[in-house]
Amino acid sequence: MSAESGPGTRLRNLPVMGDGLETSQMSTTQAQAQPQPANAASTNPPPPETSNPNKPKRQTNQLQYLLRVVLKTLWKHQFAWPFQQPVDAVKLNLPDYYKIIKTPMDMGTIKKRLENNYYWNAQECIQDFNTMFTNCYIYNKPGDDIVLMAEALEKLFLQKINELPTEETEIMIVQAKGRGRGRKETGTAKPGVSTVPNTTQASTPPQTQTPQPNPPPVQATPHPFPAVTPDLIVQTPVMTVVPPQPLQTPPPVPPQPQPPPAPAPQPVQSHPPIIAATPQPVKTKKGVKRKADTTTPTTIDPIHEPPSLPPEPKTTKLGQRRESSRPVKPPKKDVPDSQQHPAPEKSSKVSEQLKCCSGILKEMFAKKHAAYAWPFYKPVDVEALGLHDYCDIIKHPMDMSTIKSKLEAREYRDAQEFGADVRLMFSNCYKYNPPDHEVVAMARKLQDVFEMRFAKMPDEPEEPVVAVSSPAVPPPTKVVAPPSSSDSSSDSSSDSDSSTDDSEEERAQRLAELQEQLKAVHEQLAALSQPQQNKPKKKEKDKKEKKKEKHKRKEEVEENKKSKAKEPPPKKTKKNNSSNSNVSKKEPAPMKSKPPPTYESEEEDKCKPMSYEEKRQLSLDINKLPGEKLGRVVHIIQSREPSLKNSNPDEIEIDFETLKPSTLRELERYVTSCLRKKRKPQAEKVDVIAGSSKMKGFSSSESESSSESSSSDSEDSETEMAPKSKKKGHPGREQKKHHHHHHQQMQQAPAPVPQQPPPPPQQPPPPPPPQQQQQPPPPPPPPSMPQQAAPAMKSSPPPFIATQVPVLEPQLPGSVFDPIGHFTQPILHLPQPELPPHLPQPPEHSTPPHLNQHAVVSPPALHNALPQQPSRPSNRAAALPPKPARPPAVSPALTQTPLLPQPPMAQPPQVLLEDEEPPAPPLTSMQMQLYLQQLQKVQPPTPLLPSVKVQSQPPPPLPPPPHPSVQQQLQQQPPPPPPPQPQPPPQQQHQPPPRPVHLQPMQFSTHIQQPPPPQGQQPPHPPPGQQPPPPQPAKPQQVIQHHHSPRHHKSDPYSTGHLREAPSPLMIHSPQMSQFQSLTHQSPPQQNVQPKKQELRAASVVQPQPLVVVKEEKIHSPIIRSEPFSPSLRPEPPKHPESIKAPVHLPQRPEMKPVDVGRPVIRPPEQNAPPPGAPDKDKQKQEPKTPVAPKKDLKIKNMGSWASLVQKHPTTPSSTAKSSSDSFEQFRRAAREKEEREKALKAQAEHAEKEKERLRQERMRSREDEDALEQARRAHEEARRRQEQQQQQRQEQQQQQQQQAAAVAAAATPQAQSSQPQSMLDQQRELARKREQERRRREAMAATIDMNFQSDLLSIFEENLF
């Protein structure tokens, strides 16, 4: 490839030119004479001219594109190294190259010409590229490696040319002047040299290209690379002249990557060609890739012998010259070039790339490469191996330990010198050993490793303005010098020595001048670099990128988990200034990076690498930042990361693993500074809320969550309340944390919460006070809720509770974004303490937040399906069901108590009805999934019972009759646990029997509001057994139960379905239906109704929502009073809840009645809570298990019929209060009628629901492990059989459950109730086990489910149930 030869030729020409520039005409004459001898046999012709002072300069958009895009792309290609310098016919032993190739050309020459505005139009440049490729094809055989490399480059070249701007327009050469000094100097320096080279150059470039085929074995490259250094030195003198500097400046930047490759092909190093090498070393950096070398090492082996050039004096001069050339382009280059003054700068500049070099060397020493790297670890032991001729053949031995020691001693100025020594080591091996020797094969393997890593080394910035770019330039100088001496043969060494001697004096003078120039350039660069750092463009881009940044940051958080990849050299200069103040934690050095890259290297050294946890937290914090701050984040990254500098901020994709530690630390500082500002106001808000509520549990949870999120949570809630940005990335995690905190608080505070309930609503546990506070301002709490939800549970819960029924509604919508905060705030204040008793409930607890969120969104669905009033209750029910889900018996009572005590409750119920309706529907879908997951996790029987009880309350929403049944459940539930039983009676005492009945229905409806849609879906749970036990509230509740019985029957089938939870929705629905029928028959007894309701509640906490809506309509007033809710009774101090509830209920009961008459209000469910305090405990126990299954079955299809029934019976609640028996009768009748209607509706709706549930289940299955899917395919047939068997088993279970429910109803006495919880727990455990088994089977069969077969099975099963 002529390109390869090009670099070599260029090096020689440069020395010649350098000599002439130095003002030693003799040197130029010698150079000219040398080229001729090269042509004759031993010398290379001068390189093609790259600048002509007599020729007008011109810059066009196409030429600019060729330099910045086409040439830059080709230069970085792994096959480009042979074409980066003129062909060194001497070094490669190609005496006939320049005889065959009359017009040599290489990319190094083209690059210089483009940088010097040598071309008049783009066509001339394209012609040079074509000449380079043609020379390679002419001189080399078609199958040679070099030809294949040239073809690959040509293909890429043609692809880039297709994108060339169509119209060529001239551009002012202002920038050229900026680089100008060096360029002008180069032009002046080269004029004399160029005149001679012009004639020879034509021949030389072709020669350069052709030899490349031979050099392809990079083995020789190490030596040639050193040769490059001498070339740089020669150019340095040129730089002193002034014209040379410009020339060097442009080449050094591209050459940096290439220097290693360039030297390899440059046998010319024996000549002053070292000069040519300078630009190439810089360029070669990327171009030199070992892959190319490995392909042709055998051909180069003989050629690489010359790399051992004796003239090391050249290297010293060359190093100085190269320094001068570098200063011309970037200040950093200048500093390294002047070894005396710039030496310190050099070390800092080189640091980034030399760090990479150190990493490459470490990898080469790694054990994984030891099998083929061991021969290169130490110097060749000539005596031990008996290699007496080794020193004669290998003039410059090299080994990895020597390279390591030089690297540690900072003897390498840049990566190019390092690469030259490594390649010298390999070339020595190829040169001394025969091609088929095993050591050669080992060298090629190791060189492949080296070249791959070396090619990936981050490029030094090529922009002259940026100081960072300079580091790349100096490295080549060092590397070039040693290789040049080794590469040049002994014959050429004498010539080069003479030329170097002549120019040494001049070099010393030039060095002084260059150092002064470097100082001036550095000052200019510093001035330029600062504006770049503050460039507004990047800020604007950053602003645009803000949105994308948020989403990408989230992805990055996941990516951060991956092991850290190489970090590109830091580009801190631009962003450091702006980001330093903001990012206090990131890196102290970022500010330094601004002015010079050297600081960056130091900073990089000082920077502590980020741990995975730190990166994850950083990504979370970045997601919290508002949009206006993200722009700055992008700016910081772009300014510090060369690879992302030119990326489009709107589409930037950032992988934390690829970012430098300094960049990450700078980001950390900035984000921390931004978040601190936000946190202060947020903290104030939290304090205000905490002070008002003074909730210990919430405060503890808040502190925990804040600590966990590292203050990111508070910021998120505060700043992103409006933007909702935190909700996207951080919220999920924060919410989880909050849930954990709530669970912990509930576990720790279960006793305290009961204690708090003793104080009436005003003094409930810390959570209750917030509720009270929020009650007066129901509207404000909703807004505060979202803010405080994530950061501090304290503040958010009080608003929810304070709102009571009305507040709950606004909060629910607000909580859609902050599900956890809202859920815990309104409902969980008391429930949280309850959760601890039942460990499995935490899953439910987490579920409630989601339910609440969904409730906020889904209430519209409830509105559509049910009357507005019922839907509102369901909304509230959505909030309440989380309480049952949590085993906090005391907390529910407390929460309800505060709500009940307030007289506004009567009015709030209406508000709640309106506001809460929308929330309920969403809860159903989310709750279904959450409960299913929780059920699996929380299989403990105890949790299941409580959950069932809680859910049993929701079932009442089905038809108006269910409200009485809900009351029965509440009363009956207390009996199942011995302690709860006493609680219901005190509540009844406080409240007249009729009123308690109303209150209980209200509470149930509140809880059931979520379940109503699931009624059809709710699977029967053992809870029915427990539900019947509560006999104490028998009188008032009996009436309600009679009405509810029909619904309870329905709910039972649903609970059965839940047991099946794993099976398709249809199966769940059908069992529910069957249970409803059986329950309907059994419903006349209160006990039957209660078990069914409990099942419903347990089966689907979410489903209860629709049920609650229906119930509430019928029992408007009672439901409104349901605030106390059964969960509160569960707590250890049921007496307190009862007392609190009783006073609250007494004053509010009248209010409740009017609300009921006016419209069905949802608040009554809260009133129900006080009597069911005891039952709540059981329910909570059951809930954990059942809630999981119920989630799937949350559907509102039956809501329409329920709503109609509710509307018909809105007045029944008041009548119930007057005559509990009459109201129960009415409810039972309505329930029975609804059951009949619902059966027809269910037949139709269940088909759609089954399909929907199937889709849900399929989605869940698709998420299951792939292994399970593979197994599923194998066991597809078995799975079908299992399903059939399971369906039969479920049917049997449903029948058994129905029987159990009847038995429980029969055992209305407290003894029966106490015995029921155990049987219920056993049943629930069995159900949970079966569900888990079914879930696993479904997972296994997920990929092979036959939907037609499934539908048939479901239809058959449904028929059997009904």
Curated annotation (Swiss-Prot):
Acetylated histone binding, annotated site positions: 140, 433
Tissue-specific expression: Ubiquitously expressed.
Sites bearing Phosphoserine, chain numbering: 470, 484, 488, 492, 494, 498-499, 503, 601, 1117, 1126, 1201, 1204
Chain positions of cross-link Glycyl lysine isopeptide (Lys-Gly) (interchain with G-Cter in SUMO1): 1111
Similarity field: Belongs to the BET family.
Name of protein: Bromodomain-containing protein 4
Compositional bias per record (Low complexity), positions renumbered to this chain: 23-43, 197-211, 478-497, 699-712, 926-936, 1211-1223, 1285-1313
PANTHER family xrefs: BROMODOMAIN-CONTAINING PROTEIN 4, FALZ-RELATED BROMODOMAIN-CONTAINING PROTEINS
Subunit: Interacts with p53/TP53; the interaction is direct. Interacts (via CTD region) with CDK9 and CCNT1, acting as an associated component of P-TEFb complex. Interacts with RELA (when acetylated at 'Lys-310'). Interacts (via NET domain) with NSD3, CHD4, BICRA and ATAD5. The interaction with BICRA bridges BRD4 to the GBAF complex. Interacts (via NET domain) with JMJD6 (via JmjC and N-terminal domains); the interaction is stronger in presence of ssRNA and recruits JMJD6 on distal enhancers. Interacts with NSD3. Interacts with NIPBL.
